[in-house]
Amino acid sequence: KLNCFKNGKDEAIGISDEIEKTLKKKYSFNNIAILVRAIFQTREFEERFLKIGLPYRILGGTKFYERAEIKDCIAYLRLIHQSKDDLAFDRIVNNPKRSIGESSIKLIHEFSKENSVSLEIASKQLIEQNLIKPKTKIGLSSFLFLMNKWRNDIKIKKTNHVKLLQLVLDESGYSAMLKNKKDIENENRLENIKELLSAMKEFDGLEPFLEHVALATSVDQDWDGEK
């Protein structure tokens, strides 16, 4: 049986409908598989299966929102949206490399804890009080400057959330980092990021998109292939 669909979303809906029909014929999940040409193409299927509560697992790969480059992008967006998001700060403060070593990150954490402030505020105060190494100060100051710039882009300039991520990828050096090392793995990462940008277009703004990601990554699926 050959079916044609006009886009990935329609394809995911059509195939999920076929899966549900197949399951009603007493087949188990172990009898069903979806083959994709490229790993980024799983995203539409994952979104659909989460929406209808259909359990799944990915063989030979990682779920879309758990891929390192996607988590990096989401961390940037989360920190732009909420400056007190310490988990996001930790993930991206030296990603790409900004000469902010482990000892400096440890210092930021200690200062944050001692003064009951976020990691971002701790970083600003360490710079202001000249308590951080000169080389680290340059990288950290640049990072904080960009964070402030991106917040102004979305709040004052009203830059839409899709364009915002494109700016982040370009201005942070993240895209260049992936493009400069030309191999299959980084090509796949760039394709995954393109798919993320496409997914973001389905939402009205940054906040609803981040809420969707939080929901998608919080779902704990119990897999039982015999059901």
Model features per residue range: what roles?
Residues 1, 51-54, 62-96:
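Conserved short internal alpha-helix adjacent to the catalytic or cofactor-binding core
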Residues 112-125:
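A short beta-strand-loop micro-motif that forms or neighbors metal/cofactor-
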